[in-house]
A protein has these predicted regions:
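Membrane-interface amphipathic segments in extracytoplasmic regions
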Residues: 1-196
Length: 196
């Protein structure tokens, strides 16, 4: 999470949407940068609106706008699958030795096994009540997000390539694709509604 005080802007770091690269590029411009632990770095819109936002707004005497990125849901799960396939991941969270189809099927189960328990972007970006994210951008159109930030921050932004998931095959059988679209209907609906 990054907070830009003078611009009254907060960036929520949706997991697997380039948040590490954004932090590397912009941390020096932010009044507040929370990178650790992950539960704080990846503060949800609900937690922001309930805890962080009210504090910032009381201190500043003005409201803050909230921006975030969202990745296409299947691509987002593919990034998690590849990320957890790398060396050094705890065995119960590792996806080594399984294909993407099995990972997605496991993610669709309730309860999810540890290796597939990565949450959902719709839960991250949708509050239980109250205001949503003010400016939501598609990860596959990150240049629009960068343009928005350049305009708000008044500087050129170049995002480095850091914390990139390894490559891997992310094929799905048609029945698994259909299952994913049913289980992740809220994610697909939110993603499809993004105009930016």
């Amino acid at each position: 999470m990054l907070v830009f005080w003078d611009q009254r802007l907060a960036f929520l770091a949706t997991p697997k949407t380039g948040s590490t690269a954004i932090a590397v590029a912009l941390e020096s411009l932010a009044a507040l940068s929370i990178q650790r632990p992950p539960v704080l770095k990846h503060t949800t819109v609900h937690r922001y609106r309930r805890f962080v936002g009210p504090y910032l707004e009381a201190a500043a005497g003005a409201p803050f706008e909230v921006c975030a990125l969202m990745r296409e849901p299947r691509d987002w799960l593919g990034s998690w699958y590849r990320f957890r396939s790398r060396e050094g991941v705890e065995p119960d969270r590792s996806t080594q030795g399984m294909d993407f189809d099995a990972f997605v099927q496991a993610w669709c189960r309730d309860p999810q096994p540890d290796f597939a328990a990565v949450g959902a972007q719709s839960r991250f970006l949708t509050p239980r009540n109250g205001a949503r994210v003010d400016h939501l951008f598609r990860y596959d159109r990150i240049e629009r997000f960068v343009d928005f930030l350049e305009d708000r921050l008044g500087c050129e932004i170049v995002l480095p390539r850091v914390n990139v998931s390894p490559t891997g095959v992310t094929d799905l059988r048609p029945e698994t694709e259909a299952l994913l679209r049913r289980v992740a209907a809220a994610d697909f609906a939110l993603y499809d509604a993004i105009r930016a």
